[in-house]
């Protein structure tokens, strides 16, 4: 990725890959490091559904300006971790949720090995906040802090949506693009956007 100008400083940007826990997909990850400043810590971003790490570049540059190294991966089925457009939104044929969590933990392990002397934080948004919450609960002490935004909690409609989702996947396959599911999960959000893609 090279260098970025931002926040009045140079920022070194690197992109690399590692093998997903699903054993098939290459996961793209990114590191933005401020150049020539005292480092205060590492912040790993776990993005939301229908997103990718590069959507957070401006925010990452801001954090670099404060002395933080920022990293994140494109989750399975997102960004450069979706090799073909057909793969967008698809995690894996089996245990995709666990692969998603393991992939975020893999980046944590990579970064902590490089920067073990720095405080380490995870920031998760939406789906990424659920991943962050699971990692914090499964691995106490792994992170020095956790920030969640746009997270969710138990809701009576979740059970209905899960049954409908499972029924569609069972009858049409795990890569089915369902307008009904899109409307159920994103309808209220998409109504707020004129001409959503």
Regions from the language model: what does each represent?
Residues 43-51, 126:
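Active-site glycine-rich loops that stabilize anionic/oxyanionic intermediates
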Residues 46, 73-75, 149:
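Alpha/beta-hydrolase
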Residues 124-134:
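Glycine-rich nucleophile elbow surrounding the catalytic serine of serine-hydrolase chemistry
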Residues 132-197:
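Alpha/beta-hydrolase-fold enzymes
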């Amino acid at each position: 990725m090279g260098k970025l100008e931002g926040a009045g400083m140079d920022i070194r940007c690197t992109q690399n890959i590692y093998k997903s826990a699903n054993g098939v997909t290459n996961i793209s990850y990114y590191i933005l490091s401020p150049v020539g400043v005292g480092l205060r810590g590492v912040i790993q971003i776990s993005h939301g559904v229908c997103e990718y790490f590069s959507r957070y570049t401006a925010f990452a540059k801001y954090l670099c300006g404060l002395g933080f190294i920022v990293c994140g991966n494109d989750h399975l089925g997102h960004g450069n971790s979706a090799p073909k457009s057909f793969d967008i939104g698809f995690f894996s044929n089996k245990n995709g949720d666990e692969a998603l969590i393991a992939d975020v933990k893999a980046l944590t392990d990579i970064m902590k090995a490089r920067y073990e002397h720095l405080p380490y934080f995870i920031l998760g948004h939406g789906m990424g906040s659920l991943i962050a919450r699971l990692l914090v609960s499964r691995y106490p002490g792994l992170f020095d802090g956790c920030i969640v935004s746009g997270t969710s909690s138990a809701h009576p409609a979740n059970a209905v949506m899960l049954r409908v989702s499972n029924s569609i996947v069972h009858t049409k396959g795990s890569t089915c693009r369902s307008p009904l599911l899109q409307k159920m999960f994103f309808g209220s959000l998409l109504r707020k956007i004129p001409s959503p893609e």
